[in-house]
Amino acid sequence: LRLGISVALVPSYLPMLGDVLEQFRQQYPGIPLETTLLSNDAVCAQLQNGTLDAGLVMDLGGCAAGLARTALTRHTAALLVPRCSPFWGRSSIAPAELDGRLLLVPGLAPEPLAPLWNTLRQAGARPKVEIGEQYYQVLYRTQERNGLALDRLEITSDHSMGNVQDVALDGMPPICAAFLQPEHAEHPCVRLLCSFLQEHLRNL
């Protein structure tokens, strides 16, 4: 059972994922679970070409063609804002305000973040979009370059000793950790893993 995990989800977004996968291995020792850390976009691509049996990605509800999606967690979509940003201390940010700003996102594929791309287009906003995959890389780049990064809303988070904070992004559906699998594949082990992750990650 080949599972691709987006680097955007670990270690901060799903901090318990490693422990949960180890529980799965212990509970089902007959299922050989192989995990690979990949970019958000690569997980989708390798599911589509048959390299992976299942994948975990960060998304806003969209799903690439030929894949079936199950949301494991749902949170209010937000932007990670550095202390030097004019958005610091705000309760929300409108998509139109992102015009010309550096915006870090987990991937550039059109489907997973489709609501974001559509909303930016409708608002006439053209941010400088770059891929920011790993959490600590994103933390550094938002502060070093006064950028913003797609995140989930965590009011009580102790992000880097208070140098960044989350501000809600208006007009977005929930940001999710999602389980993906090929649409027409009947793989009982994949269904079992999906159910197991739903059960153990639902309170995150």
Regions found by a protein language model. Name each.
Residues 13-17, 101-123:
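Secondary-structure junction motif
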Residues 16, 115-116, 185-197:
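Short amphipathic alpha-helical coupling segments at ligand-binding clamshell hinges
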Residues 31-39, 58, 106, 124-136:
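Short beta-strand-to-loop elements that line the ligand-binding cleft
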Residues 1-28, 32-34, 44:
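N-terminal winged-helix
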